[in-house]
Amino acid sequence: MKKLFLVLIVFAGCEKESNSNPKGLKTENVILITLDGVRWEEVFLGADSRIIMNNIKDEKIREETLKAYWFEDEKERRNNLMPFLWNTIASKGQIYGNKTKGSVMHLTNPHFFSYPGYNELLVGFNDDSVNSNDKVLNPNINVLEFMNEKDGFKDRVAAFASWDVFDWIINNERNDFTINSGAFPLKDTLLTNKQRWLNKFVSDLPYEGYGTSVRWDALTHEYAFEYLKLNKPRFLYIAYDESDEFAHQKKYSQYLSIINRLDKYISSIWTWMQSHDMYRNKTTLIVTTDHGRGNYIDGKWGSHGTSVPEAEFVWSAIIGPDTPGLGEMTNTETITTSQIAATIAHLLGYDYQSNRPVGSVVKEMIK
């Protein structure tokens, strides 16, 4: 019995050591979440009454949207749209990207659409050869696979995405950690009953309006949340997509509603983590996007791409034990999407390296 007790103590000590941060920081886990194509305007200014009044033709839907999301006060609008972001992250973390207050975040790639944006975010630099949304395996080393090779992270890294192109962006042929996207079923050895049900359900959906390359964010959320509970990853990436789909269709009411729902998804994940010792006070959450969109004045609020003015401007939010609670950032140095990968690795205790030089760590995000 004494020998067994000794073994348990040694094992517990090894477990604690394997999760310790090489830089002495408190962060042991990271959750990265992206909301595809969500404009900085809605994040910081809330719903735009001009788009509601002039874009929503159905009177009933227009009135319902005004009632749900429009308030005269700017802070009330944004708090109502994204309550977790503005009540929790803003009080204990940092939010970047409000151009009206001197906080600018932008892409370094010149394309302003998804694959180049996600490449920049995950690998830490712009690659001129990544210039389409085609299903081409990404040759660049990303921060997920970088961390998957570190002590204590092997098979503790995972990615879930609504858009199936992530299998190519993250490169599932080169990497063996869990990557699940689009209408592809989750093929892990260990599955919960809900994940088995999702596997059957995801292949039966018609995906009207999206095409077969995008699944509902509700499915992505349930896949990822179940994986989090079962597998306890140390680095989890979740990429939601429906915000971009509704914006392209210029369905502003649905666009606002999905932003509100995604905020609730993020809140549920954060709340769950606070009730578990592995994650509580040891986890950094980062929320950002892959590209911006045009503005109302130009008539391009639903569009993005090289030809769309201001589609390069994005935003980011962060909360965790190593991040000062400065709230909404104002009059800051300009930051870029290419800096997020190095910042994530640094928070986990490592100096990120890829196959090319990468963006620098956002020092303001770390104490």
Describe these PLM feature segments.
Residues 54, 288-319:
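Histidine-centered active-site microenvironments of extracellular/periplasmic hydrolases
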Residues 31-32, 40, 262-302, 344:
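Metal-dependent active-site segment of extracytoplasmic phospho-/sulfohydrolases and closely related
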